[in-house]
């Protein structure tokens, strides 16, 4: 059924930079499929705004870093959410799309759905890894979920939640064969000799907890692997300043710190030591052997352990359904253990070939033209609503 010729209005909310990137990608796909007169508004960042999005509030008002900071921001976040819900109920857009940020968006989505406004959520929370009870909230709040990973629709289907697998945008963005030589030239690194990328995280708390351990591991690796060089991306000047005392404490390290360009840094590497997170998927798509690690405060770790379901935390292992790369977490993440595991990943050529095969298959599975698939799913929801009207 064709969509109405009257002006379409879609409300959207992205709460952090990664959501802004996904939202902009979705908007690009929607603009190719919906009438030019369609309007898009809500909360988004600069990438969404560049796609013609009208952001009524600043996205960084929703971006929280750490529990202490979050407590201070709660009143402002609740105020914005209340105003947004009142606006939605008054203006009744054709659909509401929440981009990630589930703690903020599910509440808005439930209000929209209860009012007869279709609610769509982009990025399924990791209910398959921990806090599985959130599936009940999803079932109450979401009409249609756009999933990044292929195993998620089956989980949602059991709870009666309609969904579409749209693939992961990183798989569309990253080439199937990484240009390691070109990345080394771009960073001024030698063409020959081993290079290890080290990524200790992007938050102050992450650097404080695992940064010293990663630097101690680098010092051990340099002793055991003569000629090895390290590259470490710093996403912001503030992060670089946070790393500087650790750099000063290890003046003999053959370390290059880059301003951002984390993907280039990983592409240049032969192996990667990385803090758990989405960046581990990026490393897999770049076909790199890696060691995954993290350290969190003891109480946080206990909560995560009790609410978790899988024996692994890294996305490459989760997607493979087994351990394909080592994980050293919490008290197991000692400098000695990290150095041993990373050097093994660096030196084992047979393992490198096996991982390349595994990660290539993973890459092809996730490469779905996410912007187009997500936009097509949204259009179908709009058509279904029109059919019921």
Swiss-Prot record:
GO cellular component entries: membrane
Source organism phylogeny: Bacteria, Pseudomonadati, Pseudomonadota, Betaproteobacteria, Burkholderiales
The answer to whether UniProt assigns keyword Signal to this entry is no
Query: Which pathway features in its UniProt record?
Result: Bacterial outer membrane biogenesis; LPS lipid A biosynthesis
* Organism in which the protein naturally occurs: Burkholderia lata (strain ATCC 17760 / DSM 23089 / LMG 22485 / NCIMB 9086 / R18194 / 383)
Record's keyword terms, sorted: Glycosyltransferase, Lipid A biosynthesis, Lipid biosynthesis, Lipid metabolism, Transferase
Q: What is this protein called?
A: Lipid-A-disaccharide synthase
**What is this protein's function per UniProt?**
Condensation of UDP-2,3-diacylglucosamine and 2,3-diacylglucosamine-1-phosphate to form lipid A disaccharide, a precursor of lipid A, a phosphorylated glycolipid that anchors the lipopolysaccharide to the outer membrane of the cell.
Q: What's the domain of life for this entry?
A: Bacteria
A Gene Ontology molecular function term for this protein is: lipid-A-disaccharide synthase activity
Documented EC number(s): 2.4.1.182
């Amino acid at each position: 059924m064709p969509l109405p010729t009257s002006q379409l209005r879609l409300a959207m909310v992205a709460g952090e930079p990664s959501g802004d990137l996904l939202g902009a990608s979705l908007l690009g796909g929607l603009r190719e499929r919906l009438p030019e007169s369609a309007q898009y508004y809500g909360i988004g960042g600069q990438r969404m705004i560049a796609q013609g999005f009208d952001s009524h509030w600043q996205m960084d008002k929703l971006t929280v870093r750490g529990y202490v900071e979050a407590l201070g921001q709660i009143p402002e976040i609740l105020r914005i959410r209340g105003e947004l819900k009142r606006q939605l109920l008054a203006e009744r857009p054709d659909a509401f799309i929440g981009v990630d940020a589930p703690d903020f968006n599910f509440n808005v989505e439930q209000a929209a759905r209860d009012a007869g406004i279709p609610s769509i959520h982009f990025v399924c929370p990791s209910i398959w890894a921990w806090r599985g009870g959130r599936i009940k909230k999803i079932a109450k709040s979401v009409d249609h979920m756009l999933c990044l990973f292929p195993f998620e629709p089956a989980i949602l289907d059991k709870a009666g939640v309609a969904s579409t697998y749209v693939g992961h945008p990183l798989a569309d963005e990253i080439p199937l064969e990484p240009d390691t030589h070109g990345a080394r030239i771009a960073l001024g690194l030698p063409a020959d000799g081993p290079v290890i990328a080290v990524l200790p995280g992007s938050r102050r708390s992450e650097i404080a907890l695992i940064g010293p351990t990663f630097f101690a591991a680098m010092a051990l690796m340099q002793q055991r692997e003569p000629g090895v060089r390290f590259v470490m991306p710093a996403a912001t000047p503030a992060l670089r300043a946070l790393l500087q005392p650790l750099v000063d404490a290890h003046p003999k390290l053959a370390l290059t710190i880059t301003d951002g360009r984390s993907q280039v840094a990983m592409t240049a590497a032969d192996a990667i030591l990385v803090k758990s997170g989405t960046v581990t998927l990026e490393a897999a798509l770049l076909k790199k052997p890696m060691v995954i690690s993290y350290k969190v405060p003891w109480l946080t770790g206990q909560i995560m352990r009790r609410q978790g379901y899988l024996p692994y935390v890294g996305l490459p292992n989760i997607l493979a359904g087994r351990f394909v790369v080592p994980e050293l977490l919490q008290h197991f993440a000692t400098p000695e253990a990290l150095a041993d595991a990373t050097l093994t990943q660096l030196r084992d050529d047979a393992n490198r070939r096996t991982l390349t095969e595994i990660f290539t298959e993973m890459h092809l599975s996730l490469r779905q033209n996410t912007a187009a698939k997500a936009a097509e799913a949204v259009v179908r929801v709009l058509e279904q609503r029109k059919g019921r009207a």
